[in-house]
Amino acid sequence: MLREMLGCCKVYISEARNKTALEAIERALKPFPPAAIVNKFEDAAYGRVGYTVVSSLANGSSSSLKNAVFAMVKTALDTINLELHCGSHPRLGVVDHICFHPLSQTSIEQVSSVANSLAMDIGSILRVPTYLYGAAEKEQCTLDSIRRKLGYFKANREGHEWAGGFDLEMVPLKPDAGPQEVSKAKGVVAVGACGWVSNYNVPVMSNDLKAVRRIARKTSERGGGLASVQTMALVHGEGVIEVACNLLNPSQVGGDEVQGLIERLGREEGLLVGKGYYTDYTPDQIVERYMDLLNNS
């Protein structure tokens, strides 16, 4: 039964260089078994780390997952100052994005309930403007739409980087939880629930951001490309720009299809395209890793 009643939460934090802060965030989860971190993906160029947290939701108990993630969020807000942060990946806050996914036989309603409860606590206790999206929000609004309204995709520093604290003293979009006043040092948080999303990034060996943006645009559903694919072109170190892809329906459109299209578009632009990579495991691999962690603990 345990194997069939698991919830997954991905927590994206705007930091990758401050090891002391990251270690504190990881320690914060430990008092809440059976919650466990099954994957950590750090990217120094982006100034971003993604944690994949899994816990049992059996017998109606979701407190372990919620409490573990809340502790990680609180520690991140206590140890990281957005005003000192810079990176080539957009962000709206210290804790930029939290997404819950059902694993195995767990329902989207179960993880949506956890997401909603967590968001209310972040807003009311930590006093950070918090936005709900996907199945956790009554209108089913998308993460993309919230980000666009809050200016997520507009870099604010030369070199196509995002740097410093949140630009506004008041958020222009009323949050689902928390105040409209926003701390420059903390920013805002988006919390949602949805089916599985895979992140697949493809490096293009170029400094021509306009050309890679054309490739990214033509790859995305929004630009007439692949269904259920969202993309951004992001500088990723010297001489490399990545087409960062969200695969919203990876069972239908996966990394191989994305890779093939970007390679073809790259040839049309006269650019060399490298082999892409996933930033996380598949749901089945995550369940397997979690069960191994439990059995070996």
From Swiss-Prot:
Keywords: Golgi apparatus, Transferase. It catalyses: (6S)-5-formyl-5,6,7,8-tetrahydrofolate + L-glutamate = N-formyl-L-glutamate + (6S)-5,6,7,8-tetrahydrofolate + H(+); 5-formimidoyltetrahydrofolate + L-glutamate = N-formimidoyl-L-glutamate + (6S)-5,6,7,8-tetrahydrofolate. It is found in: Golgi apparatus, trans-Golgi network. Pathway: One-carbon metabolism; tetrahydrofolate interconversion. Folate binds at G178, P179, Q180, E181, V182, S183, K184, A185, K186, G187. Its main location: Golgi. SUPFAM superfamilies: Formiminotransferase domain of formiminotransferase-cyclodeaminase. Disruption phenotype: Delayed root growth when grown in high-concentration 1/2 MS agar culture medium; in these conditions, roots are wider and exhibit anomalies, such as swollen and irregular cells in the root transition and elongation zones. Slower secretion in the root cap peripheral cells resulting in a significantly reduced monosaccharides content in the culture medium. Its EC number is 2.1.2.5. The keyword Metal-binding does not apply. GO terms for biological process: root development; secretion; tetrahydrofolate interconversion. The active site is at H89. GO terms for molecular function: folic acid binding; transferase activity. One of its GO terms (cellular component) is Golgi apparatus. The keyword Transmembrane does not apply. It comes from the Eukaryota. Expressed constitutively in roots, stems, leaves and flowers. Belongs to the formiminotransferase family. Involved in the regulation of root growth. May regulate sorting and/or transportation of trans-Golgi network (TGN) vesicles in root cap peripheral cells, thus influencing the extracellular secretion of mucilage components in the root cap. This is Formiminotransferase cyclodeaminase-like protein. It comes from Arabidopsis thaliana. The lineage of its organism: Eukaryota, Viridiplantae, Streptophyta, Embryophyta, Tracheophyta.
